[in-house]
């Protein structure tokens, strides 16, 4: 049985194992997929041991996406643009191929929600690996991107790096203009610690829609809870993005694209 996993820290909240087992059953693939807690001090050695033991591939989540990118010998174009990876595949020659399916997952979910229209103003909170992975697909979808981050220089660096792909600008977190954004995307990992980014509540109140890349099976994420408190009604967590990126990762590994619509139809048991 082929072995796969998702690496992160924390990782207990991950629904990736259930998703990939669902995909495997649906497509009649013989594989096992587990969640593994990465050690922030020993991650590279852990990952090396994982593949040395015969594993075929894995997903990478916070805080290891940029570190995993550096471990791979080959990269997809979208992965190179992000300098961050969420999917690794062991090739026949033993080398690691890195891909980033986060952007494809986000765009497909925004399309499913009918939230993706040309020339929208999208404010992205955070400038880490999660943001890097989605910028190129959003810019290719003709979105106008504004990035803010607690460390402003990181937002500036990203805006400079991606400005030849489309309209993108960095904003100081403490000086975001009070105006309506078509969509606010939370790409920070603060929710994993039960926290939220410190943002002026008026900005949330004026938002046409809010999307949190994080997700929670049991309750609202801290960011979604904050948005609801501010009266925002058009809200989505990142479960649909998780499903989309997982489907693209599964296709990379197995060569078959699973059907994801049943997961949102109400006719299947939710993952």
From Swiss-Prot:
Pathway assigned in UniProt: Metabolic intermediate biosynthesis; chorismate biosynthesis; chorismate from D-erythrose 4-phosphate and phosphoenolpyruvate: step 4/7
Q: What is this enzyme's catalytic activity, as reactions?
A: shikimate + NADP(+) = 3-dehydroshikimate + NADPH + H(+)
Q: Which domain of life is it from?
A: Bacteria
Q: Does this entry carry the keyword NADP?
A: yes
**Example of a GO MF term:** shikimate 3-dehydrogenase (NADP+) activity
Q: Which GO terms describe its cellular component?
A: cytosol
NCBIfam families per the record?
A: aroE, PRK00258.1-2
This chain's function reads: Involved in the biosynthesis of the chorismate, which leads to the biosynthesis of aromatic amino acids. Catalyzes the reversible NADPH linked reduction of 3-dehydroshikimate (DHSA) to yield shikimate (SA).
Similarity comment: family membership: Belongs to the shikimate dehydrogenase family.
Summarize the subunit comment: Homodimer.
Per its record, how is this protein called by name?
Answer: Shikimate dehydrogenase (NADP(+))
Q: Supply the source organism for this entry.
A: Histophilus somni (strain 129Pt)
What lineage is on file? Bacteria, Pseudomonadati, Pseudomonadota, Gammaproteobacteria, Pasteurellales
